[in-house]
Amino acid sequence: VAALPPTLEWERELAAQGYTLVAGCDEVGRGALAGPVSVGVVVIDAATAAELPGVKDSKLLRGPVRQALVPAIQEWAQAYAVGHASAAEIDAVGLMAALRLAGTRALAAVSAELLPGYVILDGNHDWLSVPVQPEILFAGPAAGPAVEPAPGAAMMVRTRIKADMTCLSVAAASVLAKVERDAMMVELAQQFPQFGWDGNKGYATAGHRAAIAGHGATDFHRRTWRLT
């Protein structure tokens, strides 16, 4: 049985609660051995947005179909952005913090245009919210100057399992993130053709692992990961 296409049901529920500007958020590249982790954000007016035919979780779409949907998604959205965290950043701070870094970069970009009040995040773990630092949480009035909030700190974030398959704004974000990250890997493949990144996009195929074993890792590989 074919899966039902994503809808705006959840976004419209949020609009009814007063959250008009809703952002869908999804990541790609989490499991890759090379390249960035990338986070797409698509902001819509949940009270007035129409359904967008053809959009679904990026993993369910062929590459040319994803590419063809990008202009329609960009026109449909009130604002959109894709943020990235590099392989070196993943090695330096770990995957969850790198996801947060990429996500806050995307949110900062859309927030320069307008500030969403609510973020729907695919999955069951909120890696996007900025962790509260205890010294800030318990600081008294004499604790010194106020700390600048990180981008996105003022937004409500709600996780939803399989949101990329059920929430249209999240599915749209997944398409933008996938297309942009794929294009980055195809471009990098011109410098490093031996790894087949134009095909595997940095993921852990047998051929990719064999190429790493034969040629060694590049600066675009996640060196703290098991690569071979």
Language-model features and meaning:
Residues 1-228:
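RNase H-like, Mg2+-dependent phosphodiesterase core
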